[in-house]
Amino acid sequence: MKKMFKIILMCSLLLTLSLSAFAKKKLYVGTNAEFPPFEYLENGKPVGFDIDLVEELGKIMDYDIKIVDMAFDGLLPALQMKKVDLVIAGMTETPERTKTVSFTQPYYTASQVIITRKGENGIKSFDDLKGKKVGVMLGFTGDIVVSKIDGVKVERYNAAYAGIMALKANKIDAVVLDSEPAKNFILQNEGLEIAQTEGAQEEYAIAIRKNDTQLMEQLDNALTEIKSNGKYQELINKYFK
């Protein structure tokens, strides 16, 4: 009986080891689901362009993608502390960020725009923000841009939607946000418009830990493949057309 038990136990262990050998590696992906259409919550689950994109990259690289939603200003610290393996969150590569993390090739080009109430306060350009109270997303490019304008009172929010609600409630004069999320909020909120001006173009990229050269190569190769096989354009058409 003992011998039979040992045989069964050994077979179970061998089966477990065999299955684990074929199991996909997990890749933990940090994001901030407050940035539609790139990442947002739907029925409590993060979805959006960035989420679909990283899922497709995972298929090419043979990784099981696990999405970890958190505050935007916590993403890079989480990456450095190895709580996640990479970050995709409509994040722009900036000189300040590249001091601590590395970025893949760009996957999307955007720009900063100004959202105002229709027909109010004469804001037509970034120069017109002087002396105004302006909402931005904490740590986003808009925060960096507006903070450099003299005479602006910057109101920082953890979610873009909170800034939009503050604008509608007359608590602030404008919101500076990336172009595609801004268009998304305009469609959902009557009485708001985008000023006919845009800031300098910026490029979104995936952040990884410095010196993680193997993952960098895998991601860059997968991005190149997805841009050439038609899948990237499918995602563009799905979320932006």
Q: Model-derived features: where do they sit?
A:
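Alpha-to-beta junction loops
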Residues: 63-64, 80-89, 132-133, 168-177, ...
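Extracytoplasmic small-molecule ligand-binding "clamshell" domains
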Residues: 24-91
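Periplasmic-binding protein-like
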Residues: 33, 109-116, 183-224, 241
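Short helix-initiation/N-cap motifs at beta->coil->alpha
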Residues: 51, 66-77, 121, 138-141, ...
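Extended ligand-binding regions for polar small-molecule ligands
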Residues: 51-60, 120, 127, 138-140, ...
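A ligand-binding cleft/hinge motif common to bilobed small-molecule-binding domains
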Residues: 91-99, 145-148, 173-200
